[in-house]
A protein has these predicted regions:
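Long, contiguous domain-sized segments
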Residues: 1-57, 62, 116-329
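Two-metal-ion RNase H-like nuclease active-site motif
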Residues: 62-72
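Acidic, metal-ligating active-site segments
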Residues: 72-116
Length: 329
């Protein structure tokens, strides 16, 4: 009944067709930092322009690597199989060099199924197979990156630094890599975070990404913002980077030590990420070029490995949703 009314209201609001912000709009009043989860680190302006030409020079001056993964889940009555392709891509002078690793996890709540297997994993009775998979995935990613990432590298990882069950493990990985002079930056495309928008204008924006889309001009980033998880004690610095007028900004996050020790490097990396998004050239789905390449490698390898066929040949009985849709819902 409310279909036409909702569509009509959206058209009136013109939610999808916002005007491009101008730099002057971004000099807004910021709240005091005392006792807050977040702290604005650059208070001269909430918006900072990015330089793609400088970003290209930075990309050619440092050793760059990017990580992404692709996984396939097969839900059976006796458990769930997860197949993951971990991929690391390095930018060489004239080509992309990839390193890939395929892993398989079979997770079940049945002790009888696990038996004396050295590769099956037992999930507790009150948890999901997904939670156990996340633990295994985190360990796999850590081992893969610690083994394959080069020393003295800028590493770009698809996904958040803080904000999921893997926060503690991810931070430990970042610290371990830093001992080898690896600076790690995380790029998130989808985020429901309201940390910044709730401080600046409560209830005015749907999310921080909504705020960034409406307040940052194209080719700009927000100020760097320090966030502390008051429950777990984890800390990160993040900003929002907007490349195109009518596409979602990206959230860039990194561990505070990197910023404290080399602010100039962090600012150069923001220019570099901006250049690599422009270099990728997808205005409908902005992404850092190296991450895009890693994603393509990972997805293609999963397709070639054809885990669905492998599992079906093993005789596992799929769930109804697995049979109907090729996945569990």
């Amino acid at each position: 009944p409310n279909w036409n009314k909702t569509i009509g209201e959206l058209k009136k609001k013109r939610v999808l067709f916002i005007s491009e912000p101008v730099a002057g709009k971004t000099n807004i009043s910021l709240p005091p930092d005392d006792g807050k989860k977040i702290q604005i680190l650059e208070k001269d302006s909430i918006s900072h322009d990015l330089n793609a030409h400088n970003g290209k020079d930075v990309a050619l001056s440092y050793q760059l690597e990017a990580y992404d993964e692709s996984y396939y889940k097969y839900a059976a009555l006796s458990g769930a199989a997860y197949f993951t392709c971990h991929t690391l891509v390095r930018l060489d002078s004239d080509d992309y060099v990839s390193m890939c690793e395929l892993t398989a996890n079979y997770i079940t709540r049945s002790e009888e199924v696990v038996g004396d297997s050295e590769v099956f994993s037992l999930a507790s009775a009150d948890s999901s197979t997904g939670a156990k998979f996340n633990e295994n995935y985190s360990e796999e990613r850590k081992n893969f990156l610690k083994t394959n990432v080069s020393d003295n590298t800028i590493l770009i990882i698809d996904g958040p630094l803080i904000g999921n069950q893997l926060s503690s493990r991810t931070i430990r990985l970042v610290k371990d890599l830093k001992e080898r002079n690896v600076a790690t930056f995380f790029v998130t495309k989808n985020s429901d975070s309201m940390l910044l928008s709730n401080e600046i204008a409560p209830k005015k924006y749907h999310s921080d990404l909504d705020w960034a889309s409406k307040n940052l001009p194209s080719g700009h980033r927000s100020s760097f913002i320090k966030y502390k998880d008051l429950n777990a004690g984890h800390t990160e610095i993040f900003c929002y980077l907007k490349t195109y007028a009518y596409a979602s900004p990206l959230r860039i996050s990194f561990y505070p030590t990197i910023y404290n020790e080399n602010k100039d490097l962090v600012k150069e990396v923001m220019d570099m990420l901006y250049f690599l998004i422009l270099d990728d050239g997808n205005q409908n789905n902005p992404q850092v070029r190296l991450i895009r390449i890693a994603e393509l490698f990972a997805k293609d390898i999963i397709k070639i490995a054809n885990p669905d066929r492998q599992v079906r040949m093993s005789g596992l009985i799929p769930t109804v949703n697995q049979s109907r849709f090729g996945r569990s819902l």
